Structure formats: C-alpha cells, structure tokens
UniProtKB/Swiss-Prot annotation:
InterPro entries linked to this entry: BAG5/6/7/8
Highest taxon listed in the record's lineage: Eukaryota
Tagged with keyword Endoplasmic reticulum: yes
Protein name: BAG family molecular chaperone regulator 7
Organism: Arabidopsis thaliana (Mouse-ear cress)
GO cellular component entries: endoplasmic reticulum; plasma membrane; plasmodesma; plastid
BAG domain ranges (all copies): 330-407
Comment field on protein domains: IQ domain mediates interaction with calmodulin.
UniProt GO BP: cellular response to cold; cellular response to heat; cellular response to unfolded protein; protein folding
Main localization of the protein described in the UniProt heading: endoplasmic reticulum
Listed Basic and acidic residues bias regions: 239-250
The entry's keywords: Apoptosis, Calmodulin-binding, Chaperone, Endoplasmic reticulum, Phosphoprotein, Stress response
This protein's encoding gene: BAG7
C-alpha cells in the first residue's frame, strides 16, 4: 500500500483557487519520525524577494493541519500548492481576497470591495500585471501591485498600500513625489517652449476711428483705420481706410404750405369779409403745424410690442363675436318656442278652449311669461341681437294682453301694447263655428 492518498479539500466559505493542484495525507511511522523531512517541497519562487518574503504576510505556502493524534501514531495533512508560472498574480489575488473575506467577517460584515486586474502578454515573453483592490469600511484601504516580467528574466515589482487614518508606505510616497516632479518639469518645459515661440512671433494691433460731420449738408462720415505689425526682422504695416456709413440727417421736415388764392373785387364789403376768412384759415393752419411739432416724430413701434397689441385687439374681437353669437343662438332657441306659442294662439279651437277653461288659460299665460323673461335676459351689443329681441318682446306682450288682459288702473311703467286683433272678430268667428257645427249635426240626423 502507498503512504500517499489523494483527496480534494473545499473551503466552507470560499472555493479553492485553481492554482491548488494536489494534496496528500501522510501517515508517518515510527521509523520516519526521526528524519527531519521526507516530503519534497520544491516550490517555484516566482517573485524572488529577499528574506523575509513579503508573501509571508498573507499565508505560508505549505500548511500543516493536524487531523488526528493518538499515543501510537500521528496523522498530518500536508497541503502542497504548486504555483504555475502562468498564474502568479491570480494566486496572489485569491489569497488576498481570502484573507480579506475572513477579516471582514470578524471585524466589519458590511464592507464593499473592488478589484481590477489587467494583464498584458507579448510574444517575446514580456508580461505586465496590474492589480488594484479597494476596501471601504471603517478603515478604507487600497492595495496596488504592479509586476513586469521581460523575456530576458528581469522582473520589476511595485507594491503600495494606502490606509485612510494611517500611514502610507515609503515606496508609494516616493513614487508619488517622483511623478509630481516629472509633471512639474514637463509643464515648465512646455511653458518655456511656448514663450520661445511667442517671442519669435509678436503682433500688435492699433484701432483708430475718425468721425467727421458736416452740418451744412447734414452728412456724417466714419473712417476706420487698422494697423497690424508683426515682430521680428520683417515688419509690415497695413492701413485700411473704409467709409462704411454715410448718414444724411435733416434737421427739420418742411411742412407743406397751403396756397390761398385771393381774388380782388371792386366792392369793399366783399373784400373785408374775404379778408377775415383768410385770417382765420391762416390761424388754423399755424395751430395744426404747432401741434405736430410738439408731438414730434411718429415713433416706430417695436415688432414685439406691435405683436402684443395685435393679439390683444384680436382677443377682444373674438370675445365680442363669441358673445354676439351666443346671444343669437339663444334667440334662435327662443324663436322656435315662440313659433309654437304663435301656432297655438292662432288656432281657433284652442282659443275657444282658453276662453272657457281658466286653468288652460293660466298655463298658456305662464308659458308666455317664461318666454318673455328668457328673451329679456338675453344681452347683446350687436344691432341684430337688439332688433330681434325687441320684436319678440313686443309680440309676446301683445299675446299676453289678449290672453290675460290687465285691469284698467295699471301704471304707466307697466303699460304694454295691445294686440291688433279686436275681441269682436273673435266673437264672430266663434258664432260662425257654432253654426257650422249645428248644421253638420242636423245633416247627420237627416
């Protein structure tokens, strides 16, 4: 039987990394206890740090975990991790994350972690690794690892640690200082180069303006002169004269003169009367001219203000038109009701019923009064609305006078017009209708 048995171990909190390749359990006998070591622990040291190794801060490469112990024999589990040359940084990241997870579970269960890993591999064997880790918690920490491996076997490592509230590593401070110095040196060199370029090319500009005005003709002339000079051995002068604006201003606008023709006549009386009329005309013309000069020129309205005024006027027009249209619509509805009342009023059978029955007469008069009040309540400024309203009110009042006449002792304010149809005609029509009915009954009996 062999002394080495292979099995896989799984961490209950974190899964095992891919770099862990083999494990073995050794059950030593009493013969091998005297020897110092019987296991070949050849581990590839990729980083080649001088002792003490900085990787010892995270965890030793080989761990001995005691499984079982008895007075007769001891059993130990030997975990052997072989680091492949292709994944050194991955192993380091896994070990750091393992330690951080265990530490965060004990200290601060709520902690945010961020990891960034970049890897560049070239065909000649050159490799570059960059690893950054940020931990947010009560103590914010930041780790950075940069590794460069060239094909010839040269290796470069940079390890920086930042802890807020604590101290930074000396290497990180030195690197930051060097970077700042390099940036300052570059900025100074760029500024000096720009100064040299500017010295070679210098430009100066002169701007002059001349304004001339002639009051006699009312013309104003503007001349602009631009002078540009460039530094160095060669200097050039450019003069440009442009007359851009010629504004003709008139001091006063001459008013149109009125010509008055005077006809001389022989008669003195006519001359005296015409002379007075001429004097009055001159006085009125002078007065109109003085008023115009006091008012001044007609100021042009800006487009925005003009647009606002137009909108206001149009809105007022729309409001007036909508009111008049609403009034006309109400009058049309009232006119349909008036046609119904008119048809029933001109029906002789219904008129005889009104004359006999007081309740029906009261109902008909109430209808007329309601329609009269509705027509009277309609308001409108338009001429059409007022004319239609007046004609309908007059007709309804006349119908009401016939159906329900008022007593003679009424006041002048409550006076209404009488209907044009006298009562005698109604009585004659009633008598004729009665005779016709009697004749019809007699013919049926025969």
């Amino acid at each position: 039987m062999t002394l080495f048995h292979r099995l896989d171990l799984i961490d209950p909190y974190t899964c095992t990394p891919l770099i862990v390749r083999e494990t073995s359990i050794v059950e030593p006998s009493s013969l091998f206890l005297g020897f110092p070591s019987f296991i070949d622990e050849d581990i590839e040291d990729l980083f080649e740090f001088s002792s003490p190794n900085p990787l010892d801060l995270f965890e030793t490469v080989t761990d001995l975990v005691k499984i079982k112990k008895s007075p007769s024999s001891c059993k130990y589990k030997v975990i052997r991790r072989r680091l492949e040359p292709e994944y050194p940084l991955k192993y380091l990241c896994d070990r750091v994350s393992d330690l951080e997870s265990k530490f965060d579970r004990l200290v601060s269960p709520k902690s945010d972690r961020k990891y960034t890993l970049t890897k560049e591999i070239k065909g000649s064997g050159e490799r570059k690794y960059k690893w950054e880790a940020e931990i947010q918690g009560p103590l914010e920490r930041k780790y950075k690892l940069e590794a460069e491996i060239e094909g010839s076997g040269e290796r470069k490592y940079r390890w920086t640690t930042e802890i807020k509230g604590g101290k930074k590593d000396e290497e990180g401070l030195k690197l930051a200082a060097l970077k700042k110095e390099k940036a300052k040196a570059k900025a100074i060199a760029a500024a000096e180069a720009e100064k040299k370029k500017n010295k070679n090319k210098k430009k100066s500009y002169n701007w002059t303006t001349e304004v001339k005005s002639e009051r006699e003709n009312g013309e104003v002339s503007h001349t602009y002169i631009i002078k540009a000079t460039t530094g160095g051995e060669k200097k050039k002068k450019h003069e440009e004269k442009e007359k851009k604006e010629k504004i003709e201003t008139k001091s006063k606008k001459k008013e149109k003169t009125r010509v008055v023709v005077i006809e001389e006549e022989e008669e003195e009386d006519d001359e005296s009367s015409e002379h007075g009329a001429i004097v009055l005309r001159k006085a009125f013309s002078r007065r109109n001219g003085a008023v115009r000069t006091k008012k001044g020129k007609n100021k042009e309205m800006p487009p925005e203000y003009a647009a606002v005024m137009i909108q206001r006027a149009f809105k007022a027009y729309l409001i007036r038109r909508s009111k008049s249209l609403r009034a006309l619509r109400d009058l049309a509805i009232a006119k349909t009701k008036l046609k119904e009342l008119r048809a029933s009023f001109h029906n002789f059978s219904y008129r005889r019923l009104i004359a006999r029955d007081g309740e029906e007469r009261q109902k008909f008069s109430e209808k007329i009064i309601v329609l009269l009040l509705t027509v009277d309540a309609i308001e409108g400024v338009d001429v059409m609305v007022r004319g239609a309203k007046r004609s309908m009110v007059d007709e309804l009042e006349a119908m009401l006078d016939v159906v329900d006449p008022q007593p003679q002792g009424k006041s002048l304010s409550m006076r209404r017009r009488t209907f044009d149809m006298p009562d005698s005609l109604i009585r004659k029509e009633i008598a004729e209708g009665v005779t016709q009915i009697v004749q019809m009954l007699e013919t049926e009996e025969e």
